[in-house]
């Protein structure tokens, strides 16, 4: 049997040049969020299948990489009873389990930062992979809009360090639900309706209508709901909603959303707008939601929102929670397309030596430079020395020392 040299479909290898950019972005993320008081945590990539299939992950639950119970035959893999775990499809559900398990050892409220791989068994295409890195910040235990404001401020501070244009769109899941109830949908149908509405940007009003009709909903109700999104979009939830949905909305929902938008617009160097069509596909969102749009990438490059009911599914204690996820892979993709170069912070030196030369003195000198916080590479001279040095210069090795006959 011949071995296969290419990665599994939907997975990738990364060359040193791209890894340099990826590490640069991760370091920027860590340093920025640490300055806002977020604590780095880590959770396993494998989660209990019961957690992954708890109707919290929206469409992603259809994309779980399931893991068979040890020893079971591969041909029986489709039998769900034979799976007891799976690969995580995001970082939010694992964080909720983590907090429920460790709350007694954490500060309150707890500001979390987690960076790691997630897995979705979807059809690979440009910008979509089966394994990709997510970067999340979350605040657990903060019930006020201080959480949303802090998350948005920290994220805009991060994005402003990169050469990209972006807009942060903001809405509230409860406004979307109130509009659905006003149009005539039942409470128990709202999640199904919003899953279809979330595709409005991709398939348009006609596509959403066809999908909702296929789910068995009344055409008049569907059209009434869709017509609500044709109203003039004013950058104010209060002006947009008026008193139309008051019978279906909790107190202070619109007022709090107004305060989030006004505060962040005045404290962040970013374009922040109210967008009544913003949904976010995850059914676990319970309040304000936000998403980062960039004209340089089709689709969002990050998003998040409030999910106050998730942690209580693990422990019978109500715990408010809110998070923001940066689209790490998409951010890196934008930088690569711009031919972004990581700023050099250390001098790079290389010693090119003849073969069969004594190494002790040369390696000692290299270590002296490394102790001075310089990057030093020691290598033998190639037959094509000119080409060798050209490659080294491209890699940033500007200090090239050549040794001939131990000189």
Map each language-model feature to its residues.
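N-terminal targeting/leader regions
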Residues: 1-15, 190, 195-243
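TRNA-binding/sensing appendages of the translation machinery
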Residues: 1-88, 93, 149, 153, ...
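Positively charged, Gly/Ser-enriched RNA/tRNA-binding surfaces
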Residues: 21-36, 47-48, 79-82, 90-104, ...
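A short acidic (Asp/Glu
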Residues: 177-182, 333-335
């Amino acid at each position: 049997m011949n071995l296969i040299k290419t990665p599994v479909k939907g997975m990738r290898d990364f060359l040193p040049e791209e890894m340099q950019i990826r590490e640069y972005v991760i370091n920027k993320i860590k340093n920025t969020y640490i300055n806002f008081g977020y604590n780095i945590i880590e959770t396993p990539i494998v989660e209990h299948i019961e957690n992954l299939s708890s109707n919290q992950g929206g469409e992603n639950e259809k994309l779980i990489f399931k893991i068979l119970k040890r020893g079971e035959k591969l041909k029986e893999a489709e039998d769900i009873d034979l799976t007891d775990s799976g690969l995580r499809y995001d970082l939010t559900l694992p964080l909720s389990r983590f907090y429920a398990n460790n709350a007694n050892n954490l500060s309150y409220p707890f500001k979390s930062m987690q960076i790691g791989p997630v897995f979705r068994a979807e059809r690979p295409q440009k910008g979509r992979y089966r394994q990709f890195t997510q970067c999340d910040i979350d605040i657990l235990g903060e019930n006020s809009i201080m959480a949303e404001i802090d998350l948005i401020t920290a994220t805009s501070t991060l994005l402003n360090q990169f050469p990209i244009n972006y807009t942060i769109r903001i809405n509230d899941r409860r406004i979307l639900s109130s509009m659905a109830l006003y149009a005539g949908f039942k409470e128990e149908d709202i999640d199904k309706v919003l899953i279809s509405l979330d595709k409005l940007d991709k398939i348009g009003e006609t596509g959403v209508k066809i999908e909702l009709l296929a789910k068995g909903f009344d055409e008049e109700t569907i059209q009434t709901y869709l017509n609500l999104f044709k109203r003039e979009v004013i950058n104010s939830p209060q002006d947009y909603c008026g008193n139309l949905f008051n019978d279906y909305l909790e107190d202070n929902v619109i007022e709090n959303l107004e305060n989030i938008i006004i505060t962040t617009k005045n404290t962040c160097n970013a374009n922040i707008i109210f967008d009544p069509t913003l949904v976010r596909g995850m059914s676990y969102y319970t309040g304000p939601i936000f998403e980062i749009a960039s004209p340089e990438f089709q689709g969002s490059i990050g998003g998040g929102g409030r999910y106050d009911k998730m942690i209580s599914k693990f422990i019978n204690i109500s715990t408010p929670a809110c998070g923001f996820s940066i689209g790490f892979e998409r951010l890196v993709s934008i930088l690569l397309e711009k031919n972004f170069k990581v700023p050099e912070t250390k001098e790079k030196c290389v010693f090119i030596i003849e073969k069969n030369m004594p190494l002790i003195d040369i390696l000692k000198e290299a270590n002296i430079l490394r102790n001075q916080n310089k990057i030093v590479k020691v290598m033998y001279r190639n037959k094509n020395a000119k080409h060798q040095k050209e490659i080294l210069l491209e890699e940033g090795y500007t200090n090239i020392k050549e040794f001939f006959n131990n000189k």
